[in-house]
Structures are given as C-alpha cells and as structure tokens.
C-alpha cells in the first residue's frame, strides 16, 4: 500500500478502474431482472461516474486542444441522447418488457466543459466571456420555457414539438432534464474544477457535497416513510457509495499515463 501511495495512480489507471466498475454497474443495470446479478455490482459501480468526472476535469485542464476535446464529448453525448430519444418517443430498441437505458452522463460533461471554460475565462479576467458561458448553461432551460410560452401552438404541432424535444434532448441539452448524473454530479464537477490546484480542499469539498446530496438528503426524506430502517441506506439507497471514489482520487499522481488514449 505504501508503494502504491508513493507512486500513485496515473490518469490511464484511474480510467481503467472506472471502466471496470462501469461494466459491473451496467451488467447489473441491464440484467438485474434475471435475479442472477448481485447488487454489489451496482454498489461498486457507484464509484465509476465520480472517477470518470475527475479524469475529465484533469483531461480538460491539460488538453492542448479544448475545442477538439469538447467536440468529441459533445458528439458522443449527442449520439447517446439521440438513441435515448428514439427509445422514449418512438419506443424503438426497447427490451421486451419496455425497459430502456437512461445513460446520459456525457450530456452532463458537455455542460460542465462549457462551465469550466467559463471559470477559466473569469480567472483570466475575461468577464464577459466567462459570465456568458456560465449563463448560457444556466439560462438555456428558461429560454426554452419562454419560447414555449410565446409560441404555445408549437406543443400542439406533432412535428414541431418533436423537433423541440429532440433538440433539448440531444444536441442542446438542458441541465434540468438530463436523466443521468443529476444536479449533485454537476455541482461536484464545478467544485472539482474550481478548486483544482488545492487537492485536499478540492476533494474534501467534493466528498462533503456528495455525502450531503446523496446520503443526508435521501436519509432525511426516507426517514418520513413508514417502515424505513437506517440499514436501508446500505441496501437500497446506496448512491452515496460513490463518495468512496475520493480515496482513489487522492492517489492520483498528476500523470496522464500511457495507453487507452481514447478513454
């Protein structure tokens, strides 16, 4: 353990760990209905998204071509969201029992990349560009709402309403409607980037946020339910297990690593 701590884990190793955990999580997600997949697969999978988020923060900060980096994430996110759109509205590619996956984590990363760039512009005292980038992400859902209020007839037109739904699902996602990650993931991403360079403060703040959002808040709500027992936080409401990813983040040695360039 001392040797591992001294050397640390590079970016490639962290991504590989995250990928393995993601595979376990997806096996449970897709095949839980068989009753043959242990819940521990999903529990371990809670660490995957935080690790990928951390690696994306580092990747965005160090890449030599942010535009290309962003476009690649956007393209993957848009493609995955487009597939999800057809599953929802056209009921295509669904499982026999009607199940369809809701995997849109790349849409979260698309929005975060814009906010991260805005943060850097603010640091460079390019206030107009920085505020504009962040405001674009925050205000986009409200722009859509205003548009629909001004043109209510759009919602009654099948083709027009479908186009609007597709646009806000795939190419121009809204933070209020993304089905994967959620607002705690987005806030965590902002914290991780804003506090880069102060590793202990960065990871402590992130861990506290995730614990509050994914443990304290659900616990407070679940306590009001009849028959709830605290042990259910370890068997049913285990989204907060993702906070354990901070232990692996602490081992990051700042190196990109070799191989798996497309991860």
Question: Model-found features: residue ranges?
Answer:
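Alpha-helical transmembrane segments and their immediate juxtamembrane cytosolic regions
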Residues: 1-263
């Amino acid at each position: 353990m001392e040797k591992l701590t001294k050397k640390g884990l590079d970016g490639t190793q962290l991504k590989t760990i995250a990928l393995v955990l993601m595979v376990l999580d997806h096996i449970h997600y897709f095949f839980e209905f068989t009753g043959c997949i242990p819940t521990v697969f999903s529990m371990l999978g809670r660490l995957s998204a935080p690790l990928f988020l951390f690696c994306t923060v580092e990747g965005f900060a160090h890449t030599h071509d942010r535009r290309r980096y962003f476009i690649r994430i956007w393209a993957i996110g848009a493609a995955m969201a487009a597939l999800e759109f057809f599953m929802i509205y056209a009921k295509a590619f669904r499982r026999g029992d009607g199940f369809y996956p809701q995997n849109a984590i790349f849409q979260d990363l698309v929005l975060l990349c814009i906010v991260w760039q805005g943060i850097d512009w603010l640091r460079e005292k390019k206030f107009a560009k920085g505020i504009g980038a962040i405001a674009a992400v925050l205000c986009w859902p409200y722009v859509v709402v205003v548009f629909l209020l001004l043109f209510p007839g759009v919602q009654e037109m099948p083709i027009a309403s479908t186009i609007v739904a597709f646009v806000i699902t795939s190419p121009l996602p809204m933070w209020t409607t993304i089905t994967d990650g959620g607002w705690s993931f987005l806030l965590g991403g902002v914290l991780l980037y804003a506090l880069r360079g102060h590793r202990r403060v960065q990871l402590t703040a992130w861990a506290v946020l995730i614990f509050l959002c994914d443990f304290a808040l659900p616990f407070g709500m679940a306590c009001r339910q009849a028959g709830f027992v605290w042990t259910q936080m370890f068997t049913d409401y285990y989204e907060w297990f993702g906070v354990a990813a901070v232990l692996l983040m602490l081992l990051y040695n700042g190196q990109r690593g070799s191989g798996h360039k497309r991860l």
